[in-house]
Curated annotation (Swiss-Prot):
Participates actively in the response to hyperosmotic and heat shock by preventing the aggregation of stress-denatured proteins, in association with DnaK and GrpE. It is the nucleotide exchange factor for DnaK and may function as a thermosensor. Unfolded proteins bind initially to DnaJ; upon interaction with the DnaJ-bound protein, DnaK hydrolyzes its bound ATP, resulting in the formation of a stable complex. GrpE releases ADP from DnaK; ATP binding to DnaK triggers the release of the substrate protein, thus completing the reaction cycle. Belongs to the GrpE family. It is found in: Cytoplasm. PROSITE patterns: GRPE (PS01071). It holds the Pfam family GrpE. Homodimer. The keyword DNA-binding does not apply. InterPro entries: GrpE (IPR000740), GrpE_coiled_coil (IPR013805), GrpE_head (IPR009012). This is Protein GrpE. Its main location: cytoplasm. One of its GO terms (molecular function) is protein homodimerization activity. The lineage of its organism: Bacteria, Pseudomonadati, Pseudomonadota, Betaproteobacteria, Rhodocyclales. Keywords: Chaperone, Cytoplasm, Stress response. GO terms for biological process: protein folding.
């Protein structure tokens, strides 16, 4: 059954106002919404923009990689430049010593000593350190044992250094060639 209030409204002719539902026409739809073709074109443009941006980013990445490789190559090529500059003074001293016509043993010896000081100075400036382990405990990372000898020293102690070793910073350039004490 119906509601009594609705019945009264119906008798009095007071019907509730109902708005008619109006369906939009096809023309109204096309005015407010873009067509599929327009949407497709817009998406194609956006895709082209993204593709272009991707290509640019890829090219920039390649350029950065190439520049980094060039920098590394130059660093390798010119890494010894400072050290080589230091060695030029040593070479000049040796050439000057050889150019002297009348040399005595003492003058020759003092010239060689000065040249050795220049070389040691160049080594020091470039973190090239001498390893002279006489009397130290044998370290296989810095020393190369040539043989073992009887000695009064403790076992595995360096007794004789046959050839000094060298290190650049903390890396062994050449291990010291040593003779090591045998166990007692």
């Amino acid at each position: 059954m119906s509601n009594p209030e609705n019945a009264q409204d119906a008798m009095l002719g007071n019907e509730p106002a109902v708005e008619p539902v109006v369906e939009p026409t096809a023309e109204q739809h096309t005015d407010t919404l873009p067509s599929i073709e327009e949407q497709f074109r817009a998406l194609e443009l956006k895709a082209a923009e993204h593709y272009d941006a991707w290509l640019r980013a890829k090219a920039e990445g390649e350029n950065i990689r190439r520049r980094a490789q060039d920098d590394i190559s130059k660093a390798h090529k010119f890494a010894v430049e400072k050290f080589a500059g230091e060695l030029l003074a040593v070479k000049d001293s040796l050439e000057a010593a050889l150019a002297v016509q009348e040399q005595t043993v003492d003058s020759f010896k003092s010239g060689v000593e000065l040249t050795l000081k220049q070389l040691v100075s160049a080594f020091d400036k470039n973190a090239l350190n001498e390893v002279n382990p006489a009397g130290e405990k044998f370290d296989p990372h810095k020393h190369q044992a040539i043989g073992m000898v009887d000695s009064e020293q403790e076992a595995n102690t360096v007794v004789t250094v046959l050839q000094k070793g060298y290190m650049i910073a903390d890396r062994v350039l050449r291990p010291a060639l040593v003779m090591v004490a045998k166990g007692k």
